Regions:
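Conserved ABC ATPase "signature" region
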Residues: 68-71, 120-139
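A short, proline-enriched helix->beta-strand linker immediately N-terminal to the Walker B motif
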Residues: 162-166
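Catalytic Walker B motif of ABC-type/P-loop ATPase nucleotide-binding domains
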Residues: 168-171
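A short, surface-exposed alpha-helical micro-motif characterized by mixed small hydrophobic
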Residues: 209-211
Length: 250
């Protein structure tokens, strides 16, 4: 895995007779952002759910750190690898899924305390540091229902980072944000990348990805059609299907 934080090779996924992912190959270098684009139904969301172990893969491999998830393992070994993978991969879902009965601080320390067995005092100290990083330290004792959508998203990012993931996945992070909040999110994510984090972001916002992603991967029909530097793919796509998609997305 030298030179890659995550490497995906020959990834396949089907639901019944429907092939959703048809041999996906890519890798993401450390401390970079990969933006994944494509029309609805192209396989983006299924890819994300495979990367964090929410969907069982039917072919190929996913490697992150020393964890190698592959099709064909016994049920016991596969579930064991999935548990290991989830400790490496954090996810910020489109709808955040914060616990409404827990405070902001409680949401962030829940997994470190109960999954990683981090001492509560240590987890709280780290949580306050993360909240300060996302500009919400003063909201530590508030509850999710009292927060705006943008604030809830920042809590979700802090919660994911509290598990010290090697890779952070973000699903449509701009879907509920106004332009000012989108610019703020772009700056926040690049700050975390500069601090050493690696990310994969699924988004329909080309403008957002143009300011945050290092590389872009375009999917169509369950295939990787084009993958390259963000500026090249977004401004000078090499494949006609990528060009058509970008023209329609404008």
């Amino acid at each position: 895995m030298i030179g890659a934080m995550i490497r995906v090779q020959g990834l396949r996924k089907h639901f019944g007779d429907s092939q959703i992912l048809k041999g996906i190959d890519f890798e993401v270098p450390p401390q970079t952002v990969l933006g994944v684009i494509g029309a609805s139904g192209s396989g983006k969301s299924t890819l994300l759910r495979c990367l964090n172990g929410l969907e069982t893969i039917d072919g190929g491999t996913i490697e992150c750190g020393h964890v190698r998830l592959e099709a064909g393992l016994s049920h016991h070994d596969y579930r064991k690898r999935v548990r290991e993978l989830r400790l490496k991969v954090g996810t910020v879902f489109q709808h955040f899924y914060l616990f409404p009965h827990l405070s902001v601080l409680g949401n962030i320390i829940e997994a470190p305390v109960h999954v990683l067995r981090t001492p509560r005092n240590t987890a709280q100290t780290e949580a306050y540091e993360l909240l300060e990083s996302v500009g919400l330290k003063v909201a530590a004792r508030r509850y999710p229902g009292s927060l705006s959508g943008g604030e809830q998203q920042r809590v979700a990012i802090a919660r994911a980072l509290a598990m010290h993931p090697a890779l952070l996945l973000l699903d449509e992070p701009t879907s509920a944000l106004d332009p000012r909040r989108i610019n703020s999110l772009r700056t926040l994510l690049r700050t975390f990348v500069d601090r050493g984090h690696t990310m994969i972001i699924i988004s329909h916002s080309m403008g957002f990805l143009g300011g945050v992603a290092d590389h872009i991967l375009f999917m169509d029909g369950g295939h990787v059609v084009e993958h390259g530097p963000a500026e090249q793919v977004l401004n000078s796509p090499q494949d006609a299907r990528t060009k058509e998609f970008l023209e329609q997305a404008e």
